[in-house]
Amino acid sequence: MASVLPAAPAAEKKRLLPSFDRCAWVALAALVLVFVGQYFAFGYHICPDTRKYIAFSPRVNFLYPWFLAALRGVFGEESYLSWCAIVQNVFLAWSVFSLCEYLRRQLDLSNAGYLGVTFTAGACFLLQLVFTGNHILASNVIFSEGLAYPLYILLIKYTFAAWRYPSLKNALLAALFSFLLIGARGQLSWTLLVVLALGIRAMRAASRSRAVSVAAGAALAAAVFLLCSALNTASNAYKHGFGQNATMGRSVVLATAIWCSEPEDAALFPEDSPERGFLEDVNAFIDKEGCAARCAPEGLIDRFYYFTDLYDTLKDSLSTFMLEYTPLENATAFSVRIALRLAAHRPLSLLRHTSMNFLAGAVRSVAIFSPAFIVLAAVFYLVTLVTALVCRKKGVLVLESRLMLAALLLTLLNCWFVSLGVFALSRYMFYSLPLLYLAAEILFIRLLLLLFKKKPAET
């Protein structure tokens, strides 16, 4: 399936836009027909977060609300949500095609290999219809992942390009997609680390000193972060009359710290302070709803699902309690103060919680979170990691092993970042799944072909 063709010319490999031949047109047409076709079969879906994006909630990042507003302006109130799902499905089809076509040229895939990896990438998304709890494809849902998934796939493509062919242009393109991703999903702020690494690599390739390269990479990552923050603030100022960054990040960090706390931790703050009053009210709410780690069962699986069931109950209550003790413009500083104090006081509880969340995220990046799949996921990660490292050490399948290691590293970063705040919801972890399976398919089929090719020569 992933057999090798004669190497493409160097200029063709460096080309970022897709090259079209009959096979490429077939792949693109098939992806568009499948994704758009399933939309017409199932229609679009409204989820609990949809109203936040439509209403320009100050809690969410700027990109998706403005995307919906633009579609509403073009297609009208009656049909813009339908067109939103259509656009998301076409964009997803294009992003899958663009990545697979790029890998085709980089890895010199045969037509069969190219169509095989395209099928694998597309099938990973279609499996959402079977394995997610609501049996809905994300590109049909009116929420930010409808844009973020294809943007992430394109970030992978440009990251691979910027690492293999380091240049300022390629680093800037990767930074652009990181900016768009963070603009859609604050959870993906960890991609700033990718921007930092690519900026450093581009500068080192241009024979800059290590210090200059690090400074330039840091400046590029900082520029992406500051631009996202500025646009979030400007969007809230325009829509709500007050300029502040998206508040979702503040909410999840505080909710995690409180989830891991104990009732007596309110005494960490002076008796008449607003922080203490806030925590006492929240603890009374927790006693009623049971939404804290101290109320959770002990078993790993049960404990995780208890967290996922009640985390939003705690998080969504915090803003209501907070506004009784501090004005909205001071809410961020108020939240950070409490979160840092609680986290510093309960480091082991926080470590236990984030470790559980990390494990669940790692499993959900490749499978369903259950006892059997924990073992299978561990085997998958171990086998792919060892195989990629051995291939790299022996100097065989270097690009294939590099792709596999990159997939594992990006998964690690996503799991780590999610574990610190929001829980490892399936849709937060799905970003890594298509790349992991795509990279594993290419690596192991190429390895098998290499082994079978060597056998006749040895006998």
Predicted regions and their residues:
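Extracytoplasmic catalytic/substrate-binding loops of multi-pass membrane glycan-assembly enzymes
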Residues: G37-L71, F75-S79, Q244-N245, A331, ...
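Juxtamembrane membrane-water interface segments immediately following transmembrane helices
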Residues: Y44-P48, K52-I54, A218-S319
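Transmembrane-helix motifs of polytopic, lipid-linked glycan transferases
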Residues: I86-N111, P150-Y158
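Membrane-interface alpha helices of multi-pass inner-membrane proteins
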Residues: A171-R185, A221-N232
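Loop-to-helix entry region of an early transmembrane alpha helix in multi-pass inner-membrane enzymes
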Residues: G76-F97, A138-V141
